[in-house]
From Swiss-Prot:
Residue numbers spanned by region Interaction with tRNA: 150-152, 312-313
Main EC class the enzyme belongs to: transferase
Protein name, per record: tRNA-specific 2-thiouridylase MnmA
Binding site for ATP: 12-19, 38, 127
GO biological process annotation, one example: tRNA wobble position uridine thiolation
GO molecular function: ATP binding; tRNA binding; tRNA-uridine 2-sulfurtransferase activity
CDD domains in UniProt: MnmA_TRMU-like (cd01998)
Species annotation: Streptococcus agalactiae serotype V (strain ATCC BAA-611 / 2603 V/R)
EC number: 2.8.1.13
Pfam families xref list: tRNA_Me_trans (PF03054), tRNA_Me_trans_C (PF20258), tRNA_Me_trans_M (PF20259)
Length: 373
């Protein structure tokens, strides 16, 4: 067996089962393991209990069980400046942001990585479901997690080669039920803890109420694309392209019973556009433009790429052709795509490898801009 005792791995521990098992596996493999809890948000639940305090207790319990030192580090300022301000700015611009992508890029694999280096880390590790492999030239390739349902490469697509060189994903080859089983067999304190869902800083709170604390809502008109007034919307920031619920209009308005969907936003006039039918014509597009294009390894400044892409998490891959120029790209779809959403990530794949991605700016239908923003 390889002697890993001189290799120090600092594990980002959230108090959940995935990061707990990550630390356990590395310890069993003989690494010099340190656990670190990141406090990124000052939060209390509906009972006034600080959720971070409870999570830190779980980290402490697991670290004691497996016999590793542990620390807590506060990244609230970094998180506010680099993730939350971005989140609010995107909503102000009428877009639908993906804070998880930015959190991984700026906090978990930047602020945390920098902190881990001060602890003498050779690597950092997290409980993400992704895999890394190193080729004969020392280049690290990021591959999808073996559990298709849990694969998180979509959220890791903005990581750089430098970040990946320093990263381990010990759960990448495992299925989620196996991770639970390992935790239960080891008797870990977090073995039966349920997974966290949703945006970390919102938690179980009502999204509309939460956003309204930071951005003033501006109600306006809700219209069909052919100009019929359908009533009032609560504020463009509360709606996302392709959304069905929360519109307050039934099928009767259209003379048929098809459900209504958000099909566009006009930020300058504060109009929310709606249409009937899941595959409403205004929701379908043939291409998109994206910025902040980034690849996990060095690529030319300008090139054409035929690959597959995801436009949202847990979506099946779609065949695309990508025309890259600097940090901008035009992505042309082989087949019509529904509800391409500005602000979300577009992520590129070559079979199992995640190549990188960018942030969606606009969707197009045959070179005509769609009803967005």
């Amino acid at each position: 067996m390889t002697d890993n005792s001189n290799i120090r791995v600092v594990v980002g521990m959230s108090g959940g089962v995935d990061s707990s098992v990550t630390a356990l596996l590395l310890k069993e493999q003989g690494y010099d393991v340190i656990g670190v809890f990141m406090k990124n948000w000052d939060d209390t639940d509906e009972f006034g209990v600080c959720t971070a305090t409870e999570d830190y207790k779980d980290v402490a319990a697991v670290a004691d069980q497996i016999g590793i030192p542990y620390y807590s580090v506060n990244f609230e300022k970094e998180y506010w400046d680099r993730v939350f301000e971005y989140f609010l700015a995107e909503y102000r611009a009428g877009r639908t942001p993906n804070p998880d992508v930015m959190c991984n890029k700026e906090i978990k694999f930047k602020a945390f990585l920098d902190y881990a280096m001060t602890l003498g880390a050779d690597y950092v590790a997290t409980g993400h479901y992704a895999q890394v492999t190193r080729d004969e030239n020392g280049i690290v390739h990021m591959l999808r997690g073996a559990d298709n349902n849990k694969d998180q490469t979509y959220f890791l697509s903005q990581l750089s080669q430098e970040q990946l060189q320093k990263t381990l994903f010990p759960l990448g080859h495992l299925q989620k039920p196996e991770v639970r089983r390992i935790a239960e067999e080891a008797g870990l304190a977090t073995a039966k803890k349920k997974d966290s869902t949703g945006i970390c800083f919102i938690g179980e709170k009502n999204f509309k109420d939460f956003l309204g604390q930071y951005l003033p809502a501006q109600p306006g008109r809700m219209m069909t694309v052919d100009g019929r007034d359908m009533g009032e919307h609560a504020g463009l920031m509360y709606y996302t392209i392709g959304q069905r619920g929360g519109l307050g209009i039934g099928g009767q308005h259209g003379g048929d019973n098809k459900p209504w969907f958000v099909v566009g936003k006009d930020l300058s006039k504060n109009i929310l556009y709606v249409g009937q039918g899941f595959y409403h014509d205004s929701l379908m597009s043939t291409s998109l433009t994206a910025s902040e294009i980034h690849f996990t390894r060095d690529m030319p400044n300008e090139f054409k790429l035929e690959c597959t892409a995801k436009f949202r998490y847990r979506q099946p891959d779609s065949k695309v052709t990508v025309y890259v120029k600097g940090n901008q790209a035009r992505v042309v779809f082989d087949d019509l795509q529904r509800a391409i959403t500005p602000g979300q990530a577009v992520v590129f794949y070559n079979e199992q490898e995640c190549l990188g991605g960018g942030m969606i700016d606009q969707a197009y239908r045959d070179d005509k801009i769609c009803q967005y923003i």
